[in-house]
């Protein structure tokens, strides 16, 4: 009897183990790594109603939302004032109307340039020190923005009988002279610039018939710029083969020409550096 009871217990344990293995193989994942021993109970007389499994909702970890931070406030920087070139500081201190210096290699033109913003032709008979002088000095049209600069800067100078001031502009009536001396160096008090001459022509101060080159400062559009350039080239004594394009800054030099009534001789150049 003892042997038979022992055999039954062994058989019961074996059957229990087989049942557990069968349940695990069907996808039921154990809740932990140990298995509670099975306690045999009497079969229930009434059908057991299965209870609903409790589902535990997993709350995802809260991810903090990015916080927008304003960039650090910075003090607004004031625009830096341009520095006057060393070589022109004394001149500008002597007369704040001094705006630069013009030199044309191959000519005697090597003079300061001034501008009176409030009185037209103020320097027609005054030197750069504002002293009375028959020869005057080279001066820019009062409405031109020399430092921006405008699309065109007009500068006037006398044709003196002794060959000074703008008298040498008349040499540009000959193409051979232009070929050897086609560059103008015009420095403002702040910057060095070089211009290339593209047209030289006669005109008149009689506005009813003359080319009003002197009132062209800033082009309202490309057509206006192109018209100015085309007119200069059509009046020119010869073709230089140079046609400035919108965006290229121009300089117009004007002096007297006594070959015609109220005559003017005009040299026009484009900035190349």
Short names for language-model regions:
Residues 2-14:
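Bacterial N-terminal signal peptides that target proteins for export
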Residues 22-25:
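C-terminal motif of bacterial Sec signal peptides marking the signal peptidase cleavage site
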Residues 4-6, 58, 256:
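Generic extreme N-terminus detector
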Residues 61-273:
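Solvent-exposed, non-transmembrane regions of membrane-associated and secreted proteins
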Residues 31-80:
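Intrinsically disordered, low-complexity serine/threonine-rich repeat tracts
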Residues 27-29:
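Bacterial signal peptide processing site
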């Amino acid at each position: 009897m003892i042997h038979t009871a022992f055999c039954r217990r062994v058989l019961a344990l074996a059957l229990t183990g087989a049942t557990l293995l069968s349940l695990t193989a069907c996808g039921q994942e154990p809740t932990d790594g140990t298995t509670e021993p099975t306690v045999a109970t009497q079969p229930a007389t009434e059908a057991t109603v299965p209870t609903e499994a409790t589902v535990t909702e997993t709350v995802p970890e809260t991810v903090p939302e990015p916080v927008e931070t304003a960039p650090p406030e910075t003090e607004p920087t004031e625009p830096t004032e341009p520095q006057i070139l060393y070589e022109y500081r004394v001149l500008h201190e002597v007369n704040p109307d001094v705006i630069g210096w013009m030199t044309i290699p191959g000519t005697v033109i090597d003079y300061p340039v001034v501008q009176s913003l409030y009185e037209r032709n103020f320097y027609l008979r005054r030197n750069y020190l504002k002293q009375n002088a028959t020869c005057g000095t080279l001066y820019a049209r009062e409405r031109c923005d020399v430092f921006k600069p405008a699309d065109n800067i007009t500068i006037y100078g006398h044709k003196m009988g002794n060959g000074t001031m703008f008298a040498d502009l008349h040499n540009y009536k000959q193409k051979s002279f232009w070929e050897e001396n086609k560059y103008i160096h015009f420095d403002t008090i702040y910057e060095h610039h070089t211009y290339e001459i593209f047209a030289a022509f006669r005109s008149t101060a009689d506005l009813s018939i003359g080319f009003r080159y002197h009132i062209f400062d800033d082009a309202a559009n490309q057509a206006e710029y192109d018209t100015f350039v085309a007119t200069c080239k059509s009046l020119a004594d010869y073709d230089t083969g140079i046609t400035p394009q919108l965006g290229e800054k121009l300089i117009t030099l004007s002096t007297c020409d006594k070959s015609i009534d109220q005559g003017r001789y005009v040299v026009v150049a484009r900035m190349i550096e």
